[in-house]
A protein has these predicted regions:
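Helix-hairpin-helix/helix-loop-helix acidic hairpins
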Residues: 1-17
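Phosphate-backbone recognition surface of nucleic-acid-processing proteins
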Residues: 10-11, 25-135, 139, 152
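A glycine-rich phosphate-binding loop feature that marks nucleotide/adenosyl-phosphate handling sites
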Residues: 16, 57-64, 165-170
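Short, low-complexity, polar/charged sequence segments that are solvent-exposed and flexible
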Residues: 18, 109-110, 159, 164-166
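Central I-helix of cytochrome P450 enzymes
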Residues: 19-24
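Eukaryote-specific, cytoplasm-facing alpha-helical/coiled-coil scaffolding segments in long proteins
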Residues: 51, 116-121, 167-178
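Basic, amphipathic alpha-helical segments enriched in Lys/Arg and hydrophobic/aromatic residues
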Residues: 129-165, 173-177
Length: 178
């Protein structure tokens, strides 16, 4: 990991990201392929599907893809469009790790707390269970982490850094957490 500038300059300074999680991030994400922060979200399965819900393995979220069978004939199949291993590690492990940190040391814990409070105070989310709101807040904190990772990593690699859609099109400004 010491050979990767993103580890030395960014990941090592994020509370909740240890060497094992940093290894997962560095090995699973190709920052050269991520033109936008939302590209990382989509690859990690944290984007919003066409029905307005978070990406999942539900039938309506499957996409058609082509492949060559053993007779070299082109076939089509329905499958997921994200990296399930990465999604599990980011939401299940990294998200939980952020929550266990102090909000003073880990900005993503504060993002989690603020977003969860926002959800609990919103009339649109009152009917959702406590666990559902918790999962929504974890997902949001991980997405903010990925947005910061995108900016830091692309900058270190000398690649162009694009703004998020919410910044360019909607005028919503998010400050970097880390």
């Amino acid at each position: 990991l010491k050979d990767f500038p993103v580890y030395n300059e960014f990941l090592v300074n994020v509370y909740g990201v240890g060497p094992a999680m940093a290894g997962v991030i560095v090995s699973e994400i190709d920052i050269h392929a991520a033109q936008y922060p939302s590209s990382l979200w989509k690859y990690a399965g944290l984007d919003v599907a066409g029905d307005g819900y978070g990406r999942s393995r539900r039938k309506e979220h499957l996409v058609e893809s082509t492949y060559l069978d053993k007779e070299k004939k082109e076939q089509t199949k329905m499958g997921i469009s994200f990296n399930p291993f990465l999604k599990t590690k980011l939401v299940g492990v990294l998200g939980s790790s952020f929550i266990k940190q102090s909000a003073i040391k880990c900005p993503y814990r504060k993002i989690y707390d603020d977003y969860k409070h926002r959800l609990e105070s919103s009339p649109a989310h009152v009917e959702k269970s406590k666990g559902h709101r918790h999962n929504m807040a974890v997902r949001y904190a991980v997405k903010r982490f990925l947005a910061d990772l995108y900016v830091a990593w692309r900058t270190l690699e000398g690649l162009p850094v694009a703004n998020e859609y919410s910044v360019d099109k909607l005028g919503i400004v998010h400050r970097l957490a880390a």
